[in-house]
């Protein structure tokens, strides 16, 4: 992987060279997340709030047989135009590069790319986790493996409500991933505040969390550090309403023979319907809140932490 060409935008390259805070972002949410033009509105809102914190945004994606870090307006247009870029997880990076396709990176791909490219901290709205039917399908997201094996700080709103959040928390513990709540003592469920899985470690102080994360990355652990941010009460969806929608949709999915990756879209459509599409608004708002929290943590990291990543590339 270290022989793969990496193309940095001038802004990201300058930030790397000078130890400025940088925040990695996935491109899949731009290409395959919200419908147009809400996807662009969300991207621009996130870009603005990251910059307002004095942090450089670094969108990750693949084009022209290169891993790209930092997007120009032309790149953003490429990632949102039809035909859509292919969705790239960590396992797909090499093939996407070899085939010369345009790739929109998921969380797992972005975490891998961030470590490779010297980007120390990455933010995403929702991670994958352990599925509720794990005993039958053995379905566990690659996101968990990537967090455990990459020296990258990850900031997220947890995992979606239809996953098995207590089991996801247990897997992260088994993998040795530190999980810390930023302003929350409960493992958040994306656009829901409650999950029933409580966190052993949490803090209100971004500097304290940044210090702990940097210490883990530099000296303690072989892998990453996960920081969880719960949605504010103003934007969060009702936990019971979403849980009922999830349970009904999973029963319907089983009776209709919906399996594997198709379950995610099936359940998300059910939640959209049950909430009168308020879930799409919540998706937008959660992403903005998470990148704001991530940017606060990024700017709390010392310049030496970012400069050291350049030396290790």
Curated annotation (Swiss-Prot):
Manner of cofactor binding, per the entry note: Binds 1 Mn(2+) ion per subunit.
Pfam families linked: Indigoidine_A
Domain of life: Bacteria
Entries under InterPro entries matching the protein: Indigdn_synthA-like, PsuG
One GO-annotated biological process of the protein: nucleobase catabolic process
Role according to the record: Catalyzes the reversible cleavage of pseudouridine 5'-phosphate (PsiMP) to ribose 5-phosphate and uracil. Functions biologically in the cleavage direction, as part of a pseudouridine degradation pathway.
Name recorded for this polypeptide: Pseudouridine-5'-phosphate glycosidase
